[in-house]
């Protein structure tokens, strides 16, 4: 038996080969008898619904039952008895229901004599429904989905333009909900999402033309958004059942009606209704209740024939158990009588669980007779492996083949490998279809080629086998240094795919193992190599659809390759979606892929951005701790993956461009490749400079032996201890080689480092100041810096030499100028600190130089952070123009925060400044302001390590302190001048607003716990609390001013 190709997805791609399409019904092979039948169906796949079809080969003895069986088998249907095959003439709308026992060859011979083959359409449909069919179909998902698609298609073609607008809107929105089950309920509120639905998918797919033409676009959008919200919480199955519930009152899809007459002559004109609930009934007019004639289990035999009158009407006779005579029905034609007979026969077989037909009819010549002995086709001898179309004439099978495989997909013959040449080794991994092994391929060119072998566990099923081989057929089209190469296939069971072996395994595992040995340039190199592979796929108009670090293989430490093309062609297949829903890479997917199952080069760009993030994070998976169902909500709220530690800002900026919500705003892979190449070159240059810098710093040269052209360290001013001595700072190599250090380049000299005679400062002090010196006025240093790169090491022979006089003079003059400049700046800062003007402070001016707040108790500190020295640190000196900013020493000592820890938050020091010189001994307002500030300080100190459930008690304490304060102010208000009341009330309202903002930020921090935004909202909580404390101080100032005004008014003039 020749191979059967079961997947219907591949038969819709236009072919450039010599393929003769014979319309909707048949495909003709030149010079051969018709052996191929195209059957349309409603098994959903990624193509347009009008093209859902399977190509079937048949022999002379193949019957309709065999055709149906082979189609439903590959979709794992349970209720096979519900299916029937309908033949329609496209020009005249003539319909024939083909009985299961009819031979396919006889059917084709009979009908193709009347009309050309291209005018016929074969269609698989569900015709016979059991009682309570919806409950039964929910246990058979393929049948439920098939029936839904069939009914929806009939509704759109027959009555959609006549139904009420509200019903049309509901049914359309239910189809949107069913089609895009991962889409959130408010997704259509976003303009870009609605535009995808409107322009790319098309509203005509969901709503009738009459509705789209009669309603304005803006109004229609609002109606769709409002209606869609009603069904936002339904899943796919619930959407289907709701669709049937709304449609059933206006369209009876569960029964068929025929206009006919009861009796052998036109005596009683009726409408015969046949269905699971009615059985066999008739109606005399539309308003009447149906009259029951018989149940299906009462029917014993069915006969039909032509009437003997000149009109040649159809006669249908049913022998009913217990009836004295047969029930006779006269139909307008023999075709209608045959269709009625087939319907009743199908219901009888379904109800009785029988396979034998209840129809009795005369045996026509040639019908169901034994086939003649066929002649053996020449190309049959080529066997299964050549994938020829012909089959043995004696085969009584219906074999589904894929149209594209038959005519357009490249044959695997050139890639076929003899199994004897493969030596199977140890298992090195697991794939979607089976294990992956290491092995040896003994080829003529290389007798011991190391290869990877993908095996298939369940390839006895033709559909599984073909899907498994699809990856090989895809991979053979590519030839790129960073795409895994296909070596060959073995198509006989057990089926194997042989590929090149990447010895270092998956990239994700490789990154985790080599986390501490891989430098940044290597990580960027991997991203760049992947971008070249994906730009190559983009140029071939190919979409990968599963770009992730786990699907990238490491061939060498400087070479990665894109692999795993197994999902590339089947990702949108609805059966695969349902069967492997848990395996979909939701956290890597673009929003339009999650919402609408749309996969394009733009969605690949999004996934590549996530893959780059994985690489920079050394194999950490995205959205750790977030459920798949919650990912789309976070993306639509604007959340994106945070910048990895040590990631260049330019690279992270490129990632964020890949994560643009609108697909049209994402860069193409050709652009990404060019930009990654530039970033890679920049990083390599910086790495080389850092290595040169490190090699220089490794040699410890004392000042008295020369070798240092650094300025001597400045002594600390009295009263201000050295930051290094106070913090015990001694630079480690990683601190001395910061990425943003000044890079020495562009100077060519021929001598070693000259030495300065005499030891002015200890050698250790010189070493300690190297970091500052290297970052100090680089443009000036480069003017005279001698070359240190003549031989890669220091020339020690010149250590005893004395610095030339002119260079010594230049250095001393420059140092003197710098010292004078520093002295002037420090004096200016000291004068500023001494002045301390007593001004009313706002939110922008409340912070002091040391980060604290001035309070009502003079310089008394209400809160002192742990570990803060008693002395005041000198003010920060602004960097000189052109000098790179290194940051504080604390930032040098603090480790880079991990992905999960986020930004560390330190509580702010709050010390309200002194206000009016009033007696505070019995000042309730002052006491409550101080209490509120203390509550804010306590919350600030506890918020960082606190779990989310402890946020509410802390904020509640602040709220109670504020309530007490406002009550005290209300008590004091009557005694204050009336002219000041409005200002005090405004200050109170501002405090209430501050508390509301604090509560809002607290809710956001709780909502986004365990995400990258949690630390940001904690910071915003502290900011809101700080604003509350500042405004409480301002309220005290307003009341003090009112008191002073009252005192001045009471004094005698």
UniProtKB/Swiss-Prot annotation:
Which residues lie within the region annotated Disordered? Answer: 1-27, 686-741, 843-892
Active site (record annotation): 546
Catalytic activity, EC: 2.7.10.2
Q: Which residues carry this modification: Phosphotyrosine?
A: 397, 407, 576-577, 863, 926
- State where composition is biased (Basic and acidic residues): 686-697
Provide the FERM domain boundaries. 35-355
Q: Which Pfam families match?
A: FERM_C_FAK1 (PF21477), FERM_M (PF00373), FERM_N_2 (PF18038), Focal_AT (PF03623), PK_Tyr_Ser-Thr (PF07714)
Alphabetically list the UniProt keywords: Angiogenesis, ATP-binding, Cell junction, Cell membrane, Cell projection, Cytoplasm, Cytoskeleton, Developmental protein, Kinase, Membrane, Nucleotide-binding, Nucleus, Phosphoprotein, Transferase, Tyrosine-protein kinase
Instruction: Describe what happens upon changing residue 395 to A.
Output: Abolishes interaction with PIK3R1
A GO MF label: non-membrane spanning protein tyrosine kinase activity
PTM (free text): Phosphorylated on tyrosine residues upon activation, e.g. upon integrin signaling. Tyr-397 is the major autophosphorylation site, but other kinases can also phosphorylate this residue. Phosphorylation at Tyr-397 promotes interaction with SRC and SRC family members, leading to phosphorylation at Tyr-576, Tyr-577 and at additional tyrosine residues. Isoform 2 is phosphorylated on serine or threonine residues, but apparently not on tyrosine residues.
Q: Which residues bind ATP?
A: 428-434, 454, 500-502
Regulation of its activity: Subject to autoinhibition, mediated by interactions between the FERM domain and the kinase domain. Activated by autophosphorylation at Tyr-397. This promotes interaction with SRC and phosphorylation at Tyr-576 and Tyr-577 in the kinase activation loop. Phosphorylation at Tyr-576 and Tyr-577 is required for maximal kinase activity. Inhibited by TAE226.
Membrane association type: Peripheral membrane protein
Q: Which InterPro entries match?
A: Band_41_domain, FADK_N, FAK1-like_FERM_C, FAK1/PYK2_FERM_C, FERM/acyl-CoA-bd_prot_sf, FERM_2, FERM_central, FERM_domain
**Recorded domain comment:** The C-terminal region is the site of focal adhesion targeting (FAT) sequence which mediates the localization of FAK1 to focal adhesions.
Listed name of the protein: Focal adhesion kinase 1
The organism of origin for this protein: Gallus gallus (Chicken)
Give the gene that encodes this protein. PTK2
